[in-house]
Amino acid sequence: MEKFAPEFHGEDANTKATKFLESLKGKFTSSKDSRKKDSIISVNSIDIELPKESPITSTNHNINQPSEINDTIAANQVHIRKPLVSFKEELPSSENPFTKLYKETIETFDNNEEESSYSYDEINDQTNDNITARLDRIDEKLSEIIGMLHTLVVASAGPTAARDGIRDAMVGLREEMIEKIRSEALMTNDRLEAMARLRDEESEKMTKDTSDEVKLTPTSEKLNMVLEDESSDNDLSLEDF
């Protein structure tokens, strides 16, 4: 037969229940828990008592949404656009001694025929008259340079060794410039002689030709045009030969 727990009824059941609860109270209650409790937190219908020694502190943290953060950053940032090109302010003419020289140089090389004594057509024109004119201009510039150096030498002449050194340096510079201009003139003369020699050689070849039709070769025509035609502005190149 199966055994069943005894059943209690009436006053007897009440007495047994009271004794059972008192026995449980003695087992789960200590002397330390007899102190006054500060607060009770209710979580899912379970009562938890907190002692006085363990206070609970709460802090509030505000978490911004990403859109709010972006708006705040955009509002706080100030975008300053840098210029693509920066220009230096020019010094006043009183403080910059090279302003006048700079302006004169620009005016000389800005294709202004009144200021510049050389043009592209004149440089490429290798006729006799043009080369002679260029040599005349070289001589004129050389005279100006010599006069300027002579003036500086006289101005710097003196008893001190420093002034003597300046004078010697200027004289050496003058001689160097004279030599450069002289070499340029010699190169021009050599070129004219070479062109004349080539023309003569082409002419001799044509005189030896026994064919009925006599005409100049392309090279001879080129040389003849350069040496005799004053209006020609053609130049020779290595491909012509």
Swiss-Prot record:
Keywords: Host cytoplasm, Host-virus interaction, Inhibition of host NF-kappa-B by virus, Phosphoprotein, Viral RNA replication, Virion. Residues 199-215 have a biased composition (Basic and acidic residues). The keyword Lyase does not apply. Residues 39-57 are annotated as: Important for viral particle assembly. The record marks T108 as: Interaction with protein M2-1. Its main location: virion. Residues 199-241 are annotated as: Disordered. Residues 227-241 have a biased composition (Acidic residues). The modification Phosphothreonine is found at T108. Residues 232-241 are annotated as: Binding to the N-RNA complex. It is found in: Virion; Host cytoplasm. It holds the Pfam family Pneumo_phosprot. Changing I46V: In strain: ATCC 51908. The keyword Mitochondrion does not apply. Residues 90-110 are annotated as: Binding to protein M2-1. GO terms for biological process: symbiont-mediated suppression of host NF-kappaB cascade. Residues 1-30 are annotated as: Binding to monomeric RNA-free nucleoprotein. GO terms for cellular component: host cell cytoplasm; virion component. GO terms for molecular function: RNA-directed RNA polymerase activity. Changing H61Q: In strain: ATCC 51908. Disulfide bonds: none annotated. Constitutively phosphorylated by host. Phosphorylation at S-116, S-117, S-119, S-232 and S-237 is required for transcription inhibition by M2-2 and viral particle egress. Phosphorylation at S-232 and S-237 increases the affinity of the binding to the nucleoprotein. Plays critical roles in regulating RNA replication and transcription through its interactions with multiple proteins. Tethers the RNA-directed RNA polymerase L to the nucleoprotein-RNA complex. Recruits the M2-1 protein, a processivity factor that is required for efficient transcription of viral RNA. Acts as a chaperone for neo-synthesized nucleoprotein by forming an N-P complex that preserves N in a monomeric and RNA-free state and prevents the association of nascent N with host cell RNAs. Recruits the host phosphatase PP1 to inclusion bodies to regulate viral transcription. The N-terminus is important for viral particle assembly. The oligomerization region is central. The C-terminus part contains binding regions for the RNA-directed RNA polymerase L and the nucleoprotein. This is Phosphoprotein.
